[in-house]
A protein has these predicted regions:
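Conserved acidic catalytic loop of the alpha/beta-hydrolase fold
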Residues: 1-16
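Short beta-strand immediately N-terminal to the catalytic nucleophile in serine-hydrolase-like folds
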Residues: 18-20, 46
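Gly/Ala-rich beta-loop-alpha elbow adjacent to hydrolase catalytic centers
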Residues: 20-24, 28
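Short, hydrophobic alpha-helix immediately C-terminal to the catalytic nucleophile
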Residues: 29-33, 202
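Flexible "cap/lid" loop of the alpha/beta hydrolase fold
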Residues: 33, 39-85
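Alpha/beta-hydrolase
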Residues: 63-64, 68-154
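Conserved loop-alpha-helix segment in the C-terminal half of the alpha/beta-hydrolase fold
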Residues: 139-189
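Catalytic active-site module of serine/aspartate enzymes centered on a nucleophile-bearing elbow/loop
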Residues: 178-213
Length: 213
């Protein structure tokens, strides 16, 4: 987080508007609780203040999936058989429900389990989160700054998709903890509202920036 402050100072940017999505949303929150005086505003999409909360909600989504998804994932993980085609199919099902619901997938989506190999997952992602979104084993799984949200003092917009893997409960927690925060949930969207409903996505963010600028 301090690196971002040094970069901002070196570039002589003054206060900035900060946007973070997904894991960038986690970082966005972590930065704001320490350095909100450097921010004109911040926008967090599909972020959280608590990895344990995010993981708990993702495990709930797994449990609520069709039985074959839950059974296959639990069995293959217990056996260490993550490259099993049945496991890949089950993980893909969750991605299609909670990461991008468009069918067919847009050409720039290249990170579904059926499109890659778990063994080829980026090392940083693997260490910090895991081999895929719904199997969090990385070293950031205990990160939690929920009790510091009251320190955020800049205008804040919190957004997510109704069917987001980082569920609305995460965004609602952020919204409650940050004074004057605004919350928008994109209906019929999951983790990628910029692709699933771009008109609404840009309208919400444009209106927020116009108001706080």
């Amino acid at each position: 987080m301090s690196r971002r402050s040094r970069e901002r100072a070196a570039l002589k940017l003054g206060k900035v508007h900060m946007y973070g999505v997904s894991f960038g949303g986690f970082l966005n929150v972590g930065y704001a609780v320490k350095y909100s005086n450097n921010l004109s505003s911040r926008m967090t999409q599909s972020g959280t203040s608590s990895s344990p909360l995010a993981i708990s909600e993702m495990m709930r989504l797994r449990r609520e999936a069709p039985g074959w998804v839950t059974e296959t994932m639990d069995r293959c993980e217990a056996e260490g058989d993550l490259e099993n085609p049945e496991y890949v199919k089950a993980a893909d099902y969750l991605y299609r429900q909670h990461l991008c619901r468009l069918d067919p997938l847009p050409p720039d989506i290249r990170w579904f389990p059926s499109q890659t190999k778990f063994r080829d997952v980026n090392l940083v992602y693997r260490l910090m989160w895991g081999v895929h979104e719904f199997y969090p084993t990385g070293n950031s799984k205990y990160w939690d700054v929920t009790n510091q949200l009251g320190q955020v003092g800049c205008p804040t917009l919190v957004t997510c998709g109704r069917f987001d893997e980082i569920t609305p409960k995460n965004s609602e927690t952020l919204n409650r903890g940050i004074r004057g925060s605004r919350l928008h949930i994109f209906e019929n969207c999951s983790h990628t509202p910029i692709l699933e409903d771009p008109v609404a996505f840009f309208r919400v963010h444009r209106d927020f920036l116009q108001e706080v600028s």
